[in-house]
Amino acid sequence: LLNSFSANGSEAFEEIETNEKADNVKNYDFRMPKKFTKEQLKTVESIFETYARVISSYLTGLLRLYCKVEVMQIEEQRYYEFNNALPDYVMLSTVNMGIVDEDVLETSIIMQLANPITYCMIDRLMGGDGQFTSINRDFTEIEVGLMSNVMSKLAASLKQAWDPFIEVNPV
């Protein structure tokens, strides 16, 4: 009698337990984790729309040519996917965001300029007309030096865009 009661009771208990688990379980894709909520992505988009306006003004003055920078899309991407999509020669800069918050450790970002844009900017900075010609080579030391100054100013412009949300001192 006890065996039949305990056998039936354990089946009923297991059935209740699986039903409770089924209600609380959410599917999670470990291969492609989503770390940001839609609200956070909208905030990031707002920040970078402000940033686009700021650097549009900076680049227009620097290059003596009307420049319009726009946010096309915000998406999450793993670093190795980003890295694998880069061409062989690319203009990259790492920026320490200098977040003023004791709860946040050092936070760095990567800024990348597409090669056609980089070569057009270099041409304008050197007095040319900024026409793009397809170039597939590494950057010279002079080109890197010119773009280092530009990238520093672009990094410093991040402060104005991020300040309404968090105090940063990008370097």
What feature does the model see in each segment?
Residues 1-171:
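N-terminal auxiliary interaction/assembly segments of multi-subunit proteins
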